[in-house]
């Protein structure tokens, strides 16, 4: 799992960033055009690990759930994890026999933080020659070796914290992308959409969402704003490129040990690209060291989530749509490179792993009051058969709500009045049909409230009061540039919370 990746960031999903390792996995595996996450870091991790919606599972405490590590460990698997945890306690408290990484939601890529752990013990980050994306795979390879030494099948969960802010890149990766983003976000987004259609990930007649009012046209930015934004995208691209390189090291290790063809590899992101601009601008800066970093960019987040609208946290397609790649040559019955248009969700991962791993998902636990798993096994899709989902896919983070039922999507921005879209011919959610389909709207709202009560067991959500629509939609943490903005005075020395423009 990667962190804050845009839907179109990687090559096989339309991106210009060089991701040959992921592209090869996709070419020899299966891609999903409609794989969903929860639009937020910790809640997606809960769903990935438990097969439940976050609140149903007991949120970060996991008080009503078991994890995939616990399930597969019981079935005889060697269980290991590296990277970002972002939940309560530690991975070693939830079935992982080996763990390296940080318990926090984000950290400096070069110096880490004080939450790093190795197998339940505090781990001191080295003073030099450290970068989290690389370290995650260093330890992943070590854990795979340990699994082989005890002759056990393995379950490895690698949770990269890239490309989550702070935006930090290794010098060589950063240098590779200098000069590649001078054209700006409008042209990059157009190119990505064209490539997505050419690849067949999206239909050729799809109408993309327009540039929203809070995103300035690239040619309307002043020179220093363009320079600053170019630098941010160069850094993001470098971070994503590095993730791909490290995935390549994992794949090479599996191949060397004759395990690649019979290993299920799943690649997903926890949410869409992040728009929250929480740092003052820096000019003439290279974020290739611990002292210099950038915050996220709303403009690039819009382009990176192409062709959709909105972002991390929002339950619109831009927030919840993730690349979804499965590589398993010995198990997949689909054609190499095939694309499935069947909707899937992170809640389906645990049931799928338990199904193929011949493991039982328990209904009782000595210290937790378990609730039913909401996800279903994706075996039919992997075997080139239709998938039947009896219940809609429930969508929620904080006050962003939604429901996916067949081709229809109910969605609310920050608890504002409900909107309704037919994704069969409007995946980018351009035409709100709430007024034209009042009965369908009401039925879906009632179903969302019912699931809030019966599945999540949340009275608060079930009785949520919707607010009037805000036009245009806004967020105080989105980047807002104006012609009157002055260049930062201190350039690379600028620090602190982003000031409201």
What are these language model-derived features?
Residues 465-470:
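Long, compositionally biased
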